[in-house]
Swiss-Prot record:
Keywords: Aminoacyl-tRNA synthetase, ATP-binding, Cytoplasm, Ligase, Nucleotide-binding, Protein biosynthesis. InterPro entries: aa-tRNA-synt_IIb, aa-tRNA-synth_II, aa-tRNA-synth_II/BPL/LPL, Ser-tRNA-ligase_type_1, Ser-tRNA-synth_1_N, SerRS_1_N_sf, SerRS_core, tRNA-bd_arm. Its EC number is 6.1.1.11. ATP binds at residues 281-283, 368-371. One of its GO terms (cellular component) is cytoplasm. The lineage of its organism: Bacteria, Pseudomonadati, Pseudomonadota, Betaproteobacteria, Burkholderiales. The keyword Hydrolase does not apply. Belongs to the class-II aminoacyl-tRNA synthetase family. Type-1 seryl-tRNA synthetase subfamily. NCBIfam families: serS. This is Serine--tRNA ligase. It comes from Variovorax paradoxus (strain S110). One of its GO terms (biological process) is selenocysteine biosynthetic process. It catalyses: tRNA(Ser) + L-serine + ATP = L-seryl-tRNA(Ser) + AMP + diphosphate + H(+); tRNA(Sec) + L-serine + ATP = L-seryl-tRNA(Sec) + AMP + diphosphate + H(+).
Amino acid sequence: MLDITLLRKDLASAVAGLEKRKKNQPYLDVSAFTALEAERKTLQTRTEEIQARRNALNKQIGPLKAKGEPVDALMAEVNALKAEQESQSARLDQIQPELQALLLAVPNLPHVSVPVGEDEAGNVEMRRWSPQGGAGANAAPLPFAAKDHVDLGAPLGLDFEMGAKLAGSRFTVMKGPIARLHRALAQFMLDIQTEKHGYAECYVPYIVNAATLSGTGQLPKFEGDLFAAKKGGQEGEPAPDHSALYLIPTSEVPLTNFVRDEVVAEAQLPIKLTAHTPCFRSEAGSAGRDTRGMIRQHQFDKVEMVQIVHPEKSYDALEQMTGHAEAVLQALELPYRVVLLCTGDMGFGATKTYDLEVWLPAQNTYREISSVSNCEAFQARRLQARFKNAQGKNELVHTLNGSGLAVGRTLVAVLENHQNEDGSINVPAALRPYLGGLELLRG
């Protein structure tokens, strides 16, 4: 959530920043905000005037009563002022949630270093890496026609028909060797993030309440992207209030909420958390996109990284976390590139985002495998997540999140990049300890 003080002081500047996101929509209802703010100021001024007048009258009434002089007229005025003040205060209490509702629908402001653009065409490649050539090198082509992960995975136990039978489209079943590979990848990622990069491993609920999703920005704007959960015996639709429950779209949601309504000591920062969880997304608006294979699923696994940091250190943390995701790709010998997202392609809560895109030979292109974002104080303001600074004052933290990595897409990349002409898969050296020393996967 944006700082309302910023909007009050320089609304035009904030609107100009929002317009850089280049989406054809009013991010902020300026007329509604301006009208509510004008009414709020008027009510607040009048309430203060009433209180001052009541205080003055009360000072007069006491001495007059002591002298036995009549105070009926003054008392009548005090009572009238009290009634008016209560009415004004009641309206003020109504305006605050109305302003809050407006602000909850407003995205974060892009950082000055973010390129302005309408969509992914405006993104800027920062660097690329390949196992054959290192930094700056393109992915080396395979010496034979590449098969895609669907054909490679089928003999290894990748079963889309069973997934459709059990749950519908965009679900997958994995059995045997490929299920083992999937598990090994998740364990490998967790070990890198905990043992090498210092994240604390966490186990979190896969179902969270609406307040938790509001804190990280998924609600109220993106409810259509979520799966709502209904308790057994519950009639009708889930309640539209904070008692409603949803499947998590990412473990960023519960992990970041660890600091909701908390004031942490400055010495505790940075707080670095990671978790391996399934993620559930309705993929609303994705009809017809990536219908073949595992690239876009309703349920997928991810190892998430979250950092809660001092505001002065969040951009250093962004670069660090991007490197933490890159380390997984390099260890798995997967070619990739790092892309700085433009204003029109960034997520709702982000002020700056790097995407890591892995090379998929069968598609002859790079595909997103991780997004790493700095949200500055945007989530922290919604969460009321603060730290006590050196002056003893409470200050909002900055929050960052990133995939380290999406397990299913990493599985796809391993299959396609490490395939042999006969369809067998070379197991990357870093993964072999997680597969009992196995060097080759065959159907």
